[in-house]
Curated annotation (Swiss-Prot):
Protein name per Swiss-Prot or TrEMBL: Asparagine--tRNA ligase
Primary enzyme class: ligase
Catalytic activity: tRNA(Asn) + L-asparagine + ATP = L-asparaginyl-tRNA(Asn) + AMP + diphosphate + H(+)
Organism: Hahella chejuensis (strain KCTC 2396)
BP GO terms, sorted: asparaginyl-tRNA aminoacylation
Assembly mode: Homodimer.
Localization terms from the record: Cytoplasm
Any GO molecular function: asparagine-tRNA ligase activity
UniProt family annotation: Belongs to the class-II aminoacyl-tRNA synthetase family.
Record lineage: Bacteria, Pseudomonadati, Pseudomonadota, Gammaproteobacteria, Oceanospirillales
Enzyme Commission number: 6.1.1.22
Length: 465
Protein backbone atom coordinates (compact mmCIF):
# COMPACT_ATOMS: atom_id res chain seq x y z
CA UNK A 1 0.00 0.00 0.00
CA UNK A 2 1.11 3.58 -0.63
CA UNK A 3 0.62 6.44 1.81
CA UNK A 4 -0.74 9.49 -0.01
CA UNK A 5 -1.26 13.08 1.00
CA UNK A 6 -4.95 13.87 0.60
CA UNK A 7 -4.05 16.73 -1.73
CA UNK A 8 -2.43 14.22 -4.12
CA UNK A 9 -5.50 11.99 -4.15
CA UNK A 10 -7.77 14.94 -4.91
CA UNK A 11 -5.42 15.94 -7.75
CA UNK A 12 -5.85 12.45 -9.26
CA UNK A 13 -2.26 11.39 -8.59
CA UNK A 14 -3.41 7.86 -7.73
CA UNK A 15 -5.32 5.58 -10.09
CA UNK A 16 -8.96 4.81 -9.43
CA UNK A 17 -9.15 1.24 -8.16
CA UNK A 18 -5.73 1.31 -6.48
CA UNK A 19 -5.17 0.64 -2.80
CA UNK A 20 -4.23 3.76 -0.86
CA UNK A 21 -3.54 4.81 2.71
CA UNK A 22 -4.19 8.21 4.26
CA UNK A 23 -3.17 9.41 7.71
CA UNK A 24 -4.90 12.30 9.40
CA UNK A 25 -7.62 13.53 11.71
CA UNK A 26 -11.39 13.24 11.73
CA UNK A 27 -13.28 16.32 10.63
CA UNK A 28 -16.68 14.67 10.96
CA UNK A 29 -18.41 11.29 11.12
CA UNK A 30 -21.90 10.50 9.86
CA UNK A 31 -23.59 7.13 10.31
CA UNK A 32 -26.34 5.77 8.06
CA UNK A 33 -29.15 3.46 9.10
CA UNK A 34 -27.74 0.89 6.70
CA UNK A 35 -24.68 0.45 8.90
CA UNK A 36 -22.23 2.55 6.92
CA UNK A 37 -20.16 5.41 8.36
CA UNK A 38 -18.91 8.35 6.31
CA UNK A 39 -15.75 9.83 7.80
CA UNK A 40 -14.20 13.03 6.53
CA UNK A 41 -10.43 12.77 7.01
CA UNK A 42 -8.13 15.79 6.88
CA UNK A 43 -4.33 15.86 6.90
CA UNK A 44 -3.54 19.57 6.38
CA UNK A 45 -2.15 19.13 2.87
CA UNK A 46 -5.07 20.99 1.28
CA UNK A 47 -8.31 22.68 2.25
CA UNK A 48 -10.59 19.73 1.50
CA UNK A 49 -10.94 16.50 3.42
CA UNK A 50 -11.45 13.14 1.74
CA UNK A 51 -14.39 10.91 2.54
CA UNK A 52 -13.77 7.39 3.81
CA UNK A 53 -16.73 5.04 3.51
CA UNK A 54 -16.61 2.43 6.28
CA UNK A 55 -18.97 -0.56 6.37
CA UNK A 56 -20.12 -2.15 9.63
CA UNK A 57 -18.52 -5.44 8.55
CA UNK A 58 -15.12 -4.02 9.50
CA UNK A 59 -13.85 -6.06 12.49
CA UNK A 60 -13.28 -2.99 14.70
CA UNK A 61 -16.36 -1.06 13.51
CA UNK A 62 -18.15 -1.07 16.87
CA UNK A 63 -15.00 -0.89 19.00
CA UNK A 64 -13.21 1.92 17.16
CA UNK A 65 -15.08 3.45 14.22
CA UNK A 66 -18.19 4.34 16.22
CA UNK A 67 -15.99 6.05 18.81
CA UNK A 68 -14.47 8.46 16.29
CA UNK A 69 -15.21 12.12 16.95
CA UNK A 70 -13.86 15.39 15.56
CA UNK A 71 -10.12 15.58 16.22
CA UNK A 72 -9.40 11.86 16.56
CA UNK A 73 -6.35 10.67 14.63
CA UNK A 74 -6.51 7.62 12.39
CA UNK A 75 -5.02 5.71 9.49
CA UNK A 76 -7.37 4.62 6.73
CA UNK A 77 -6.52 2.06 4.06
CA UNK A 78 -8.83 1.13 1.23
CA UNK A 79 -9.68 1.28 -2.44
CA UNK A 80 -9.80 4.65 -4.18
CA UNK A 81 -13.10 4.94 -6.06
CA UNK A 82 -14.95 7.63 -7.94
CA UNK A 83 -17.25 9.56 -5.64
CA UNK A 84 -20.95 9.32 -6.54
CA UNK A 85 -21.65 12.52 -4.63
CA UNK A 86 -21.04 16.10 -5.67
CA UNK A 87 -18.07 18.23 -4.63
CA UNK A 88 -15.34 15.59 -4.69
CA UNK A 89 -13.86 13.46 -7.43
CA UNK A 90 -12.95 10.44 -5.33
CA UNK A 91 -13.38 8.73 -1.98
CA UNK A 92 -11.96 5.72 -0.16
CA UNK A 93 -13.84 2.46 0.35
CA UNK A 94 -12.15 1.54 3.61
CA UNK A 95 -10.80 -1.95 4.22
CA UNK A 96 -8.96 -0.93 7.38
CA UNK A 97 -9.37 1.85 9.93
CA UNK A 98 -6.70 2.14 12.62
CA UNK A 99 -7.58 4.39 15.53
CA UNK A 100 -4.36 6.17 16.56
CA UNK A 101 -5.50 8.75 19.11
CA UNK A 102 -8.84 9.56 20.74
CA UNK A 103 -10.07 12.95 21.91
CA UNK A 104 -10.32 12.56 25.68
CA UNK A 105 -13.58 14.44 26.18
CA UNK A 106 -15.35 15.34 22.92
CA UNK A 107 -17.81 17.58 24.77
CA UNK A 108 -15.03 19.92 25.93
CA UNK A 109 -12.75 19.70 22.87
CA UNK A 110 -11.98 23.41 22.26
CA UNK A 111 -12.09 23.23 18.46
CA UNK A 112 -15.00 20.86 17.96
CA UNK A 113 -16.94 21.16 14.72
CA UNK A 114 -18.48 24.61 15.14
CA UNK A 115 -17.49 28.13 14.25
CA UNK A 116 -15.39 30.02 16.80
CA UNK A 117 -14.39 33.67 17.03
CA UNK A 118 -10.78 34.46 16.17
CA UNK A 119 -10.40 36.03 19.60
CA UNK A 120 -11.37 32.73 21.24
CA UNK A 121 -8.98 30.81 19.01
CA UNK A 122 -6.06 33.04 20.05
CA UNK A 123 -6.51 31.57 23.52
CA UNK A 124 -6.03 28.06 22.13
CA UNK A 125 -3.31 28.88 19.61
CA UNK A 126 -1.87 25.38 19.98
CA UNK A 127 -5.12 23.92 18.58
CA UNK A 128 -6.24 26.57 16.11
CA UNK A 129 -4.28 25.15 13.12
CA UNK A 130 -6.89 22.35 13.18
CA UNK A 131 -9.59 24.79 12.06
CA UNK A 132 -10.38 25.56 8.43
CA UNK A 133 -9.29 29.19 8.69
CA UNK A 134 -5.92 28.61 10.31
CA UNK A 135 -5.11 25.60 8.18
CA UNK A 136 -5.71 27.80 5.14
CA UNK A 137 -3.61 30.64 6.59
CA UNK A 138 -0.76 28.21 7.25
CA UNK A 139 -0.74 26.89 3.69
CA UNK A 140 -0.86 30.41 2.25
CA UNK A 141 1.98 31.46 4.56
CA UNK A 142 4.05 28.50 3.38
CA UNK A 143 3.34 29.24 -0.29
CA UNK A 144 4.29 32.90 0.14
CA UNK A 145 7.49 31.96 2.01
CA UNK A 146 8.58 29.74 -0.87
CA UNK A 147 7.58 32.44 -3.35
CA UNK A 148 9.80 35.00 -1.58
CA UNK A 149 12.89 32.82 -1.90
CA UNK A 150 12.04 31.68 -5.42
CA UNK A 151 11.56 35.25 -6.67
CA UNK A 152 14.88 36.48 -5.33
CA UNK A 153 16.79 33.35 -6.35
CA UNK A 154 15.52 33.64 -9.92
CA UNK A 155 16.52 37.34 -9.93
CA UNK A 156 20.08 36.52 -8.85
CA UNK A 157 19.84 37.72 -5.24
CA UNK A 158 21.90 36.30 -2.36
CA UNK A 159 20.03 35.46 0.86
CA UNK A 160 21.81 37.03 3.84
CA UNK A 161 21.13 35.75 7.37
CA UNK A 162 21.36 38.97 9.35
CA UNK A 163 21.82 38.83 13.15
CA UNK A 164 18.92 38.75 15.59
CA UNK A 165 21.15 40.09 18.38
CA UNK A 166 22.41 43.60 17.70
CA UNK A 167 23.70 46.80 19.27
CA UNK A 168 22.13 48.96 16.54
CA UNK A 169 18.73 50.66 16.42
CA UNK A 170 18.09 50.91 12.69
CA UNK A 171 14.85 52.87 12.97
CA UNK A 172 15.95 55.17 15.79
CA UNK A 173 12.61 54.78 17.56
CA UNK A 174 14.06 53.24 20.70
CA UNK A 175 11.39 50.52 20.85
CA UNK A 176 13.89 47.75 21.58
CA UNK A 177 13.89 44.51 23.53
CA UNK A 178 17.02 44.41 25.66
CA UNK A 179 18.93 41.12 25.89
CA UNK A 180 20.97 40.49 29.02
CA UNK A 181 22.43 37.72 31.17
CA UNK A 182 22.98 40.04 34.13
CA UNK A 183 21.50 39.06 37.50
CA UNK A 184 18.41 41.26 37.76
CA UNK A 185 18.59 41.05 41.56
CA UNK A 186 22.19 42.22 41.67
CA UNK A 187 22.89 44.53 38.74
CA UNK A 188 26.43 45.93 38.38
CA UNK A 189 26.53 49.73 38.42
CA UNK A 190 28.88 52.35 37.05
CA UNK A 191 30.22 55.21 39.19
CA UNK A 192 27.31 57.33 37.97
CA UNK A 193 24.80 54.73 39.16
CA UNK A 194 23.80 53.42 35.73
CA UNK A 195 23.74 49.74 34.81
CA UNK A 196 27.23 48.63 33.79
CA UNK A 197 26.65 46.71 30.57
CA UNK A 198 30.38 46.17 30.14
CA UNK A 199 29.88 43.31 32.61
CA UNK A 200 27.17 41.77 30.42
CA UNK A 201 27.61 38.81 28.05
CA UNK A 202 28.50 40.90 24.98
CA UNK A 203 30.31 43.62 26.93
CA UNK A 204 27.80 46.25 25.84
CA UNK A 205 24.09 46.94 25.74
CA UNK A 206 22.48 44.51 23.30
CA UNK A 207 19.01 44.20 21.80
CA UNK A 208 16.79 42.08 19.58
CA UNK A 209 16.90 43.43 16.04
CA UNK A 210 14.23 45.78 14.71
CA UNK A 211 15.49 45.40 11.13
CA UNK A 212 18.20 43.64 9.16
CA UNK A 213 18.62 46.57 6.79
CA UNK A 214 21.89 48.07 8.02
CA UNK A 215 23.56 44.66 8.03
CA UNK A 216 22.21 43.66 4.64
CA UNK A 217 23.52 46.92 3.14
CA UNK A 218 27.04 45.74 3.95
CA UNK A 219 26.55 42.64 1.82
CA UNK A 220 24.76 44.59 -0.90
CA UNK A 221 27.92 46.65 -1.41
CA UNK A 222 29.83 43.48 -2.22
CA UNK A 223 27.24 41.10 -3.71
CA UNK A 224 25.12 43.66 -5.66
CA UNK A 225 21.71 42.07 -5.02
CA UNK A 226 20.82 40.68 -1.60
CA UNK A 227 17.88 40.17 0.72
CA UNK A 228 17.11 39.16 4.27
CA UNK A 229 13.99 37.34 5.42
CA UNK A 230 13.70 36.68 9.12
CA UNK A 231 12.23 37.63 12.49
CA UNK A 232 12.32 41.18 13.86
CA UNK A 233 11.17 42.62 17.16
CA UNK A 234 9.54 45.85 18.32
CA UNK A 235 8.85 46.67 21.98
CA UNK A 236 5.97 48.89 20.96
CA UNK A 237 3.20 48.80 23.57
CA UNK A 238 0.51 48.77 20.92
CA UNK A 239 -2.56 46.54 21.14
CA UNK A 240 -3.88 46.99 17.61
CA UNK A 241 -4.78 44.68 14.74
CA UNK A 242 -1.68 45.84 12.82
CA UNK A 243 1.06 45.38 15.43
CA UNK A 244 3.08 42.44 16.71
CA UNK A 245 6.07 42.41 19.04
CA UNK A 246 7.65 39.63 16.96
CA UNK A 247 7.15 39.45 13.22
CA UNK A 248 8.98 38.58 10.00
CA UNK A 249 10.47 41.07 7.57
CA UNK A 250 11.47 40.83 3.92
CA UNK A 251 14.23 43.34 3.12
CA UNK A 252 15.95 43.33 -0.30
CA UNK A 253 18.78 45.69 -1.19
CA UNK A 254 20.15 46.47 -4.67
CA UNK A 255 23.42 48.21 -5.61
CA UNK A 256 23.89 50.75 -8.41
CA UNK A 257 20.21 51.60 -8.02
CA UNK A 258 18.04 54.64 -7.38
CA UNK A 259 14.50 55.10 -6.07
CA UNK A 260 12.90 54.26 -9.41
CA UNK A 261 14.80 50.97 -9.54
CA UNK A 262 13.58 50.27 -6.02
CA UNK A 263 9.97 50.97 -7.04
CA UNK A 264 10.36 48.68 -10.06
CA UNK A 265 11.61 45.88 -7.81
CA UNK A 266 8.76 46.35 -5.33
CA UNK A 267 6.17 46.18 -8.11
CA UNK A 268 7.66 43.04 -9.66
CA UNK A 269 7.94 41.41 -6.25
CA UNK A 270 4.33 42.01 -5.21
CA UNK A 271 2.95 40.92 -8.58
CA UNK A 272 4.93 37.68 -8.29
CA UNK A 273 3.70 37.01 -4.75
CA UNK A 274 0.06 37.52 -5.63
CA UNK A 275 0.21 35.53 -8.86
CA UNK A 276 1.79 32.56 -7.10
CA UNK A 277 -0.82 32.44 -4.36
CA UNK A 278 -3.68 32.76 -6.87
CA UNK A 279 -2.22 29.95 -8.98
CA UNK A 280 -1.23 27.56 -6.20
CA UNK A 281 -3.74 28.10 -3.41
CA UNK A 282 -7.05 28.54 -5.22
CA UNK A 283 -8.79 26.21 -2.74
CA UNK A 284 -7.76 28.27 0.27
CA UNK A 285 -8.40 31.58 -1.50
CA UNK A 286 -11.94 30.43 -2.32
CA UNK A 287 -12.48 29.85 1.41
CA UNK A 288 -11.19 33.32 2.30
CA UNK A 289 -13.42 34.89 -0.35
CA UNK A 290 -16.45 33.03 1.02
CA UNK A 291 -15.88 33.36 4.75
CA UNK A 292 -13.48 36.25 5.41
CA UNK A 293 -13.55 38.93 2.71
CA UNK A 294 -15.39 38.64 -0.64
CA UNK A 295 -12.85 40.94 -2.32
CA UNK A 296 -9.63 39.05 -1.59
CA UNK A 297 -9.32 37.31 -4.94
CA UNK A 298 -10.41 40.26 -7.08
CA UNK A 299 -8.08 42.70 -5.36
CA UNK A 300 -5.10 40.38 -5.82
CA UNK A 301 -6.01 40.02 -9.49
CA UNK A 302 -6.18 43.82 -9.64
CA UNK A 303 -2.69 44.08 -8.13
CA UNK A 304 -1.34 41.59 -10.69
CA UNK A 305 -3.03 43.11 -13.73
CA UNK A 306 -2.72 46.85 -13.16
CA UNK A 307 0.38 49.00 -13.43
CA UNK A 308 1.38 50.70 -10.19
CA UNK A 309 0.84 54.47 -10.43
CA UNK A 310 3.66 56.69 -9.11
CA UNK A 311 2.82 59.97 -7.39
CA UNK A 312 5.14 62.46 -5.73
CA UNK A 313 4.36 63.12 -2.05
CA UNK A 314 3.76 66.82 -2.75
CA UNK A 315 1.31 65.92 -5.51
CA UNK A 316 -0.45 63.47 -3.18
CA UNK A 317 -0.90 66.22 -0.58
CA UNK A 318 -2.51 68.49 -3.19
CA UNK A 319 -4.83 65.71 -4.34
CA UNK A 320 -5.97 65.03 -0.79
CA UNK A 321 -6.43 68.71 0.03
CA UNK A 322 -8.53 69.32 -3.08
CA UNK A 323 -10.60 66.12 -3.17
CA UNK A 324 -13.48 67.49 -1.13
CA UNK A 325 -13.41 64.59 1.33
CA UNK A 326 -13.26 65.25 5.06
CA UNK A 327 -10.55 63.20 6.74
CA UNK A 328 -10.15 62.43 10.43
CA UNK A 329 -6.45 63.33 10.33
CA UNK A 330 -5.10 66.61 8.89
CA UNK A 331 -3.57 66.73 5.42
CA UNK A 332 -0.59 69.05 5.38
CA UNK A 333 2.81 69.10 3.69
CA UNK A 334 5.32 67.85 6.23
CA UNK A 335 2.97 65.40 7.93
CA UNK A 336 3.00 61.68 7.25
CA UNK A 337 0.09 60.14 5.38
CA UNK A 338 -2.37 58.21 7.52
CA UNK A 339 -4.10 55.00 6.49
CA UNK A 340 -7.26 56.86 5.47
CA UNK A 341 -5.23 59.10 3.14
CA UNK A 342 -3.34 56.17 1.64
CA UNK A 343 -6.52 54.21 1.00
CA UNK A 344 -8.23 57.20 -0.62
CA UNK A 345 -5.34 57.57 -3.05
CA UNK A 346 -5.26 53.88 -3.97
CA UNK A 347 -8.96 53.05 -3.87
CA UNK A 348 -10.77 56.24 -4.90
CA UNK A 349 -8.39 58.57 -6.71
CA UNK A 350 -6.47 55.99 -8.74
CA UNK A 351 -8.32 52.70 -8.35
CA UNK A 352 -5.03 50.83 -8.52
CA UNK A 353 -1.83 50.35 -6.51
CA UNK A 354 0.03 53.61 -5.87
CA UNK A 355 3.68 54.35 -5.09
CA UNK A 356 4.11 57.66 -3.25
CA UNK A 357 7.66 58.99 -3.59
CA UNK A 358 9.93 61.71 -2.14
CA UNK A 359 8.76 62.38 1.40
CA UNK A 360 9.78 65.29 3.68
CA UNK A 361 13.11 64.50 5.30
CA UNK A 362 11.85 65.31 8.81
CA UNK A 363 9.46 62.35 8.87
CA UNK A 364 11.86 59.75 7.47
CA UNK A 365 14.90 57.87 8.73
CA UNK A 366 18.49 59.15 8.70
CA UNK A 367 19.71 56.61 6.13
CA UNK A 368 17.40 57.83 3.32
CA UNK A 369 19.08 59.80 0.53
CA UNK A 370 18.61 63.56 0.70
CA UNK A 371 17.20 64.96 -2.54
CA UNK A 372 18.62 68.01 -4.30
CA UNK A 373 15.82 70.23 -2.94
CA UNK A 374 17.25 69.67 0.58
CA UNK A 375 13.65 69.23 1.79
CA UNK A 376 12.77 65.70 0.78
CA UNK A 377 14.39 62.28 0.78
CA UNK A 378 14.23 59.55 -1.86
CA UNK A 379 11.71 57.46 0.06
CA UNK A 380 8.67 55.56 -1.16
CA UNK A 381 5.59 53.82 0.18
CA UNK A 382 3.64 51.30 -1.87
CA UNK A 383 -0.09 51.67 -1.22
CA UNK A 384 -2.47 48.80 -1.91
CA UNK A 385 -6.25 49.13 -2.26
CA UNK A 386 -7.89 47.70 0.84
CA UNK A 387 -5.02 48.25 3.26
CA UNK A 388 -2.89 51.29 2.43
CA UNK A 389 0.86 51.05 2.94
CA UNK A 390 2.22 47.57 2.32
CA UNK A 391 5.87 48.36 1.50
CA UNK A 392 8.20 51.11 2.66
CA UNK A 393 11.55 51.74 1.02
CA UNK A 394 14.15 54.26 -0.04
CA UNK A 395 17.35 54.99 -1.86
CA UNK A 396 20.05 54.99 0.81
CA UNK A 397 22.30 57.94 1.56
CA UNK A 398 25.61 56.95 -0.03
CA UNK A 399 27.53 60.22 0.62
CA UNK A 400 29.41 60.13 3.92
CA UNK A 401 29.27 63.85 4.65
CA UNK A 402 25.52 63.99 4.05
CA UNK A 403 24.98 60.81 6.06
CA UNK A 404 26.92 62.25 8.99
CA UNK A 405 24.79 65.38 8.91
CA UNK A 406 21.63 63.28 8.77
CA UNK A 407 22.70 61.09 11.67
CA UNK A 408 22.87 64.22 13.81
CA UNK A 409 21.50 63.64 17.28
CA UNK A 410 19.56 60.50 16.33
CA UNK A 411 22.54 58.19 16.72
CA UNK A 412 26.08 58.20 18.04
CA UNK A 413 28.48 58.15 15.09
CA UNK A 414 30.85 55.88 16.94
CA UNK A 415 28.20 53.16 17.18
CA UNK A 416 27.71 53.29 13.42
CA UNK A 417 31.41 53.33 12.54
CA UNK A 418 31.07 50.19 10.42
CA UNK A 419 27.99 51.54 8.60
CA UNK A 420 29.89 54.77 7.85
CA UNK A 421 32.79 52.67 6.53
CA UNK A 422 30.52 51.45 3.74
CA UNK A 423 30.48 55.05 2.44
CA UNK A 424 34.24 55.41 2.75
CA UNK A 425 35.27 52.40 0.69
CA UNK A 426 33.78 52.17 -2.79
CA UNK A 427 30.37 53.61 -2.01
CA UNK A 428 27.67 53.33 -4.68
CA UNK A 429 24.03 54.41 -4.96
CA UNK A 430 21.86 51.66 -3.55
CA UNK A 431 18.26 51.17 -2.50
CA UNK A 432 15.94 48.74 -0.80
CA UNK A 433 12.64 48.24 0.92
CA UNK A 434 11.01 46.50 3.85
CA UNK A 435 7.82 44.46 3.89
CA UNK A 436 6.23 43.01 7.01
CA UNK A 437 5.47 39.42 6.08
CA UNK A 438 2.43 39.20 8.36
CA UNK A 439 0.96 42.33 6.81
CA UNK A 440 1.39 40.72 3.39
CA UNK A 441 -0.35 37.54 4.55
CA UNK A 442 -3.18 39.52 6.12
CA UNK A 443 -3.69 41.36 2.85
CA UNK A 444 -3.69 38.16 0.81
CA UNK A 445 -6.09 36.28 3.10
CA UNK A 446 -8.32 39.16 4.18
CA UNK A 447 -7.67 38.36 7.84
CA UNK A 448 -8.18 41.61 9.73
CA UNK A 449 -5.74 40.99 12.58
CA UNK A 450 -2.06 40.16 12.10
CA UNK A 451 -2.27 38.03 15.27
CA UNK A 452 -4.21 35.56 13.16
CA UNK A 453 -1.60 35.07 10.42
CA UNK A 454 1.38 34.07 12.58
CA UNK A 455 1.42 30.74 14.45
CA UNK A 456 2.00 32.05 17.98
CA UNK A 457 1.55 35.83 18.18
CA UNK A 458 3.67 37.85 20.61
CA UNK A 459 1.93 41.01 21.82
CA UNK A 460 1.90 43.15 24.98
CA UNK A 461 1.07 40.97 28.00
CA UNK A 462 1.03 37.84 25.85
CA UNK A 463 3.92 35.42 25.39
CA UNK A 464 1.98 32.21 25.99
CA UNK A 465 2.67 28.97 24.12
Amino acid sequence: MTHYAISDLLKNKAEIGSEVTVKGWVRSRRDSKAGVSFIHVHDGSCFDAIQAVVAKELPNYDADVLRLTTGCSLIVTGTLVESPGQGQSCEIQATSVELVGLVDDPETYPVAKKRHTFEFLRGVAHLRPRTNAFGAVTRVRTTLSHAVHHFFYEQGFQWINTPILTASDCEGAGELFRVSTLDMANLPKTDSGKIDYSKDFFGKETFLTVSGQLNVEAYCLAMSKVYTFGPTFRAENSNTSRHLAEFWMIEPEIAFADLNDDADLAERFLKHMFKVVLDERSDDMAFFAERINPDVVSRLENMVDKEFVRIDYSEAIKILQNCGKKFEYPVQWGLDLQSEHERYLAETHVGAPVIVMNYPKEIKAFYMRLNDDDKTVAAMDVLAPGIGEIIGGSQREDRLDVLDARIGDMHHKEELWWYRDLRRYGSVPHAGFGLGFERLIAYVTGMENVRDVIPFPRTPDNAQF
